[in-house]
Regions:
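Conserved alpha-helix/loop element of class I SAM-dependent methyltransferases that forms part
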Residues: 2-19
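Class I SAM-dependent methyltransferase SAM/SAH-binding core
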Residues: 23-67
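A short SAM/SAH-binding and catalytic strip from SAM-dependent methyltransferases
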Residues: 77-91
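A short glycine-rich, Lys/Arg-flanked "PGG" loop and its adjoining helix->strand segment in the class I
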Residues: 93-105
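Conserved beta-strand signature within the Rossmann-like core of class I S-adenosyl-L-methionine
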Residues: 106-114
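C-terminal alpha-helical "lid/dimerization" subdomain adjacent to the S-adenosyl-L-methionine
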Residues: 114-163, 169
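Core SAM-dependent methyltransferase catalytic element
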Residues: 163-184
Length: 184
């Protein structure tokens, strides 16, 4: 099996302030958003073992992001921290529809993810991070996935436009991107 590893992407979320309720998609493993915003976070992950590894901060629920079991317009924020890269095209499409449904009007969808070019000559793509969660907490996680398609801010644009999200902010480089989207 051949691996492609990105350079260490420097990401700092310490200066981001979420207001209200937060749904964290793929919130297992490192529990990045829960470590940042503590008990205001509802972390969901389809894998129980990933949630078991997450620090006990906030609520943890085994759930599929393509079938969110929440009331309409319940959350103020939804976060996806290196989660979309694990979804296939049908799942991404369904996720954006579900995210739009459970976000309140003017709610924000925050996405941090890997940029994976179409040239998948390696079997596995690994995004490596230097992640600042707070002034006192820096971690160095890696996120690996089978490399089977392109993945970028431009690629997922078709899905969030279809779901009727408005792009507020885009930051990207050759190996990662950040998107801030709003439900109108």
């Amino acid at each position: 099996m051949e691996y492609y590893e990105t350079s260490r992407q420097k990401i700092n979320i310490s200066n981001i302030h979420f207001s209200g309720r937060i749904l964290d998609i793929g919130g297992g493993g490192e529990g990045v958003i829960a470590r940042h915003s503590k008990e205001r976070v509802v972390a969901i992950d389809i894998r129980a073992d990933e949630l078991a590894e997450t620090p006990d901060l906030g609520l943890k629920i085994i759930m599929d992001a393509c079938n969110l079991q929440f009331l309409d317009e319940y959350f103020d924020n939804i976060t996806c921290f290196f989660s979309l890269m694990y979804m296939d095209l049908t799942q991404i499409d369904r996720f954006f529809s579900e995210a739009y449904r459970v976000l309140k009007k003017d709610g924000i969808l925050w996405i941090w993810d890997a940029t994976m070019p179409l040239d998948c000559s390696n079997d596995v793509f690994v995004a490596q991070l230097d992640l600042t969660i707070s002034e006192n907490e820096v971690i160095t996680p890696g996120y690996g996935v089978s490399w089977f398609r392109e993945h970028s801010a431009e690629f997922i644009e078709q899905f969030y436009i279809k779901a009727k999200f408005e792009q507020l902010e885009l930051k990207q480089n050759s190996e990662s991107f950040f998107l801030k989207l709003r439900k109108n």
